[in-house]
Amino acid sequence: MACRGGAGNGHRASATLSRVSPGSLYTCRTRTHNICMVSDFFYPNMGGVESHIYQLSQCLIERGHKVIIVTHAYGNRKGIRYLTSGLKVYYLPLKVMYNQSTATTLFHSLPLLRYIFVRERVTIIHSHSSFSAMAHDALFHAKTMGLQTVFTDHSLFGFADVSSVLTNKLLTVSLCDTNHIICVSYTSKENTVLRAALNPEIVSVIPNAVDPTDFTPDPFRRHDSITIVVVSRLVYRKGIDLLSGIIPELCQKYPDLNFIIGGEGPKRIILEEVRERYQLHDRVRLLGALEHKDVRNVLVQGHIFLNTSLTEAFCMAIVEAASCGLQVVSTRVGGIPEVLPENLIILCEPSVKSLCEGLEKAIFQLKSGTLPAPENIHNIVKTFYTWRNVAERTEKVYDRVSVEAVLPMDKRLDRLISHCGPVTGYIFALLAVFNFLFLIFLRWMTPDSIIDVAIDATGPRGAWTNNYSHSKRGGENNEISETR
């Protein structure tokens, strides 16, 4: 985990000192926020978005903010759950439509989300992922309720196919009156600005990060053979078709070469067919779905990490692999060239031929001993991306949007009509009016004043925060007494 420390005890109007590292570094802050992270993608589902939300939330809690997470139910995981440091997660009973994204009618989620926002006294809604219907719903409802909104885009999209056109139009509607947008790379920022026709000044670039203490090299790694590791969802976008062409070609050329593939998805059948056709059962291991805690143990079994993605805004997997001391070979797509310096990554075109050449280059460097030592790679990578830095930069975005005005209904309707086109604009302006009327009806049925306010688990007045601070002070007093 990236952040395990306790949060400060400050109040909204006064400056607080929050410890953000084991050393003597302290950060002065003038305000705290009540933040609600919303996305369809969260634990127990595994992926980059899920990890980003969890790690960012933990570091924001450490910095003194109140953070809750809203997602949909996963199996029997329903209701309210508490994670490390008092992080409260609402698992809502909403129907999943496709690929862990909920079905939406826009209005059905308003009663639940409104109740949570009021009960938790939320001031900022932070939605994640263009693929999440719940994230778009939360943005729409938050603006109706007069709350500040932030959106983080984790993906890249094209402009030609039907699905991209529809998603881009939805993104245009969702983001036209959102206070601020965060992208994970400069390539992603350019893509999002073009897709949603945004003002670049309200779009910030804050990359993902990795906890270096969770991804360390194995000093006892075997060198009697060469192992290429792939950890990815086995879907088309991750280039699994390319991987199916690479495996037989390199296995035929290098008898001491093995593959370890972690991940699950509809393209697994292709890899199983390749393994069966070329009789590579003892050289190609398919591990299936991995829990995040097991990823490091898989990575350190290899020498080279292969990423075959066809599109990627920011690939956390290559940072994790480099932190474990592996040589990274990756496709040159999206924001990947921004992630690691040239001496730590071999970039290739998204083709079987180019990737095979890149892997052969890495194999030659490995056999000749010209690759940097895994410990040296780890020491370099651990200084690049840290969750505390991500949290500090995100906090500045929150500070900025907290003083911005939320558009009143009349100006919001004008913005929708002028920004989204004559057809889409009028349709969503009408939906915004219906949503506002539905909100008035809900407030008449159950006024905000009679909704019970939840006891804060995190934040300046959080029960978890105060208990942690009290026990910490008690421990320090005991240490002083013992030294006397």
Swiss-Prot record:
UniProt cross-references to CDD domains, sorted A to Z: GT4_PIG-A-like (cd03796)
Cytoplasmic side stretches: 1-421
Main localization (coarse): endoplasmic reticulum
Catalytic activity: a 1,2-diacyl-sn-glycero-3-phospho-(1D-myo-inositol) + UDP-N-acetyl-alpha-D-glucosamine = a 6-(N-acetyl-alpha-D-glucosaminyl)-1-(1,2-diacyl-sn-glycero-3-phospho)-1D-myo-inositol + UDP + H(+)
Membrane topology value: Single-pass membrane protein
Domain of life: Eukaryota
Pfam families the record matches: Glycos_transf_1 (PF00534), PIGA (PF08288)
Regions crossing the membrane: 422-442
EC number annotated for this UniProt entry: 2.4.1.198
Pathway, per record: Glycolipid biosynthesis; glycosylphosphatidylinositol-anchor biosynthesis
Keywords: Disease variant, Endoplasmic reticulum, Epilepsy, Glycoprotein, Glycosyltransferase, GPI-anchor biosynthesis, Intellectual disability, Lipid metabolism, Membrane, Phosphoprotein, Transferase, Transmembrane, Transmembrane helix
Compartments where located: Endoplasmic reticulum membrane
InterPro entries: Glyco_trans_1, PIG-A/GPI3, PIGA_GPI_anchor_biosynthesis
List of glycosylated residues: 467
Associated pathology: Paroxysmal nocturnal hemoglobinuria 1: A disorder characterized by hemolytic anemia with hemoglobinuria, thromboses in large vessels, and a deficiency in hematopoiesis. Red blood cell breakdown with release of hemoglobin into the urine is manifested most prominently by dark-colored urine in the morning.
Family in the record: Belongs to the glycosyltransferase group 1 family. Glycosyltransferase 4 subfamily.
PANTHER family reported in the protein's UniProt record: N-ACETYLGLUCOSAMINYL-PHOSPHATIDYLINOSITOL BIOSYNTHETIC PROTEIN, PHOSPHATIDYLINOSITOL N-ACETYLGLUCOSAMINYLTRANSFERASE SUBUNIT A
Function: Catalytic subunit of the glycosylphosphatidylinositol-N-acetylglucosaminyltransferase (GPI-GnT) complex that catalyzes the transfer of N-acetylglucosamine from UDP-N-acetylglucosamine to phosphatidylinositol and participates in the first step of GPI biosynthesis.
Protein name, as recorded: Phosphatidylinositol N-acetylglucosaminyltransferase subunit A
Source organism: Homo sapiens (Human)
Gene this chain is encoded by: PIGA
